[in-house]
């Protein structure tokens, strides 16, 4: 019984850590504009990879973490909502580390569609 309790405590801690927002600065929002290089419709989280032109004339790759495909599908997304080659302006909660990445907030595609994860309309 003691072994089972210890296992459940460790498992609960790992599950909680998995869903942590700790890597992201939730007090800030950064907006980037670029071209989608890859969209990963995978569990447990979806990912949008965006190539963003930088000041030096090169390109920075940004990794943007989203919700699970199941969650997004219930809000109208499909695995082709975002495609490589799409022009996109995307807002994120940036990584605290300063690396090029963040947690998805909203995005606007070239055709004017606004994508959110909440299912709520945006301005």
Locations of regions flagged by a protein language model:
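Short, structured beta-strand/loop micro-motifs enriched in basic residues and often containing a Trp
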Residues: 66-74
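OB-fold/S1-family single-stranded nucleic acid-binding modules
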Residues: 95-119
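Short nucleic-acid-contacting surface segments enriched for D/E, G, S/T with interspersed K/R
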Residues: 74-89
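Short aromatic-glycine-enriched beta-strand elements
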Residues: 42-53
């Amino acid at each position: 019984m003691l072994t089972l309790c210890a296992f459940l405590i460790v498992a609960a801690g790992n599950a909680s850590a998995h869903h942590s927002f700790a890597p992201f600065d939730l007090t800030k929002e950064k907006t980037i504009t670029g071209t989608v290089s890859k969209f990963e419709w995978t569990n447990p989280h979806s990912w949008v990879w965006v190539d963003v032109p930088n000041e030096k004339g090169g390109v920075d790759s940004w990794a943007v973490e989203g919700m699970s495909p199941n969650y997004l599908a219930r809000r109208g997304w499909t695995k082709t909502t975002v495609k490589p080659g799409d022009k996109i302006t995307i807002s994120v909660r940036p990584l605290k580390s300063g690396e090029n990445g963040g947690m998805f907030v909203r995005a606007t595609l070239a055709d004017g569609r606004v994508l959110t994860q909440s299912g709520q309309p945006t301005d």
